[in-house]
């Protein structure tokens, strides 16, 4: 895993690949190779601008997307609402979670989108940071929400480019412990300050910050995750 990739090659798995391959492996215990690509991180315990430097070795230099496995919080495991507040702001869900489908039209996960706001709720200021959270499902029912694993991905591609959202099944992945992908719709900060953008393939810019509200994220079942 240490060799350099040729220019133009990136670790950019699709939603189906995150849910049916990477998240499944993590739910089965994970391994060092997978964690070098998608590390385990409580994305809500750090600021969005820190995420690029905490990403896996194949995403660390990426200016568009970062993916993490996010452990389930104790309060969430007890049936409570997870804390999405950081020192400088909070993550706010936008829209409703949606199913993610496999190529043969089966629901394989759930996708939920969040946008980062600076300040305190409900008067925070929306930024271009976007997070897509995916959870895997064990059945083909769209209403089924996975119990253990999720992943989050952060992307900073321009909102226009990210507007073409993909639908994921209930067993989605969030680049974080839950396969979670963070995205930042602003493109103006793609330069040396790429760290300020979310893992999603969007760039963070004030001019397109309003477009982030249309994103949504799915969740995985935490009971099935092995975080050791």
From Swiss-Prot:
Its main location: nucleus. Residues 77-96, 166-197 are annotated as: Disordered. GO terms for cellular component: nucleus. One of its GO terms (molecular function) is DNA binding. Keywords: DNA-binding, Nucleus, Transcription, Transcription regulation. GO terms for biological process: regulation of DNA-templated transcription. It is found in: Nucleus. Residues 80-89 have a biased composition (Low complexity). PROSITE patterns: NAC. The keyword DNA-binding applies. Residues 5-156 form the NAC domain. The keyword Ribonucleoprotein does not apply. Pfam families: NAM. Residues 168-193 have a biased composition (Polar residues). The NAC domain includes a DNA-binding domain and a dimerization domain. This is Putative NAC domain-containing protein 61. It comes from Arabidopsis thaliana (Mouse-ear cress).
């Amino acid at each position: 895993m240490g060799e350099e990739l040729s220019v133009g090659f990136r670790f950019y798995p699709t939603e189906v690949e995150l849910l049916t391959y990477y998240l499944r492996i993590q739910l089965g215990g994970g391994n060092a190779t997978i964690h070098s690509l998608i590390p385990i991180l409580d994305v809500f315990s750090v600021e969005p601008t820190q995420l690029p430097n905490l990403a896996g070795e194949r995403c660390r230099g990426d200016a568009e997307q970062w993916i993490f496995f996010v452990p389930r919080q104790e309060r969430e495991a007890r049936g409570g609402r997870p804390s999405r507040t950081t020192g400088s702001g909070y993550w706010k869900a936008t829209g409703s979670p949606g199913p993610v489908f496999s190529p043969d039209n089966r629901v394989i996960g759930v996708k939920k989108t969040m946008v980062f706001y600076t300040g305190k709720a409900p008067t925070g200021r929306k930024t271009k940071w976007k997070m897509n959270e995916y959870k895997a499902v064990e059945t083909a029912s769209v209403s089924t929400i996975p119990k253990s694993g999720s992943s989050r991905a952060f992307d900073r591609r321009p909102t226009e480019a990210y507007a073409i959202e993909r639908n994921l099944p209930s067993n989605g992945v969030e680049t974080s412990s839950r396969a979670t992908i963070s995205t930042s719709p602003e493109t103006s900060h793609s330069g040396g300050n790429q760290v300020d953008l979310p893992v999603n393939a969007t760039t963070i810019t004030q001019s397109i910050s309003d477009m982030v509200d249309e994103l949504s994220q799915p969740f995985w079942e935490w009971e099935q995750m092995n975080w050791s």
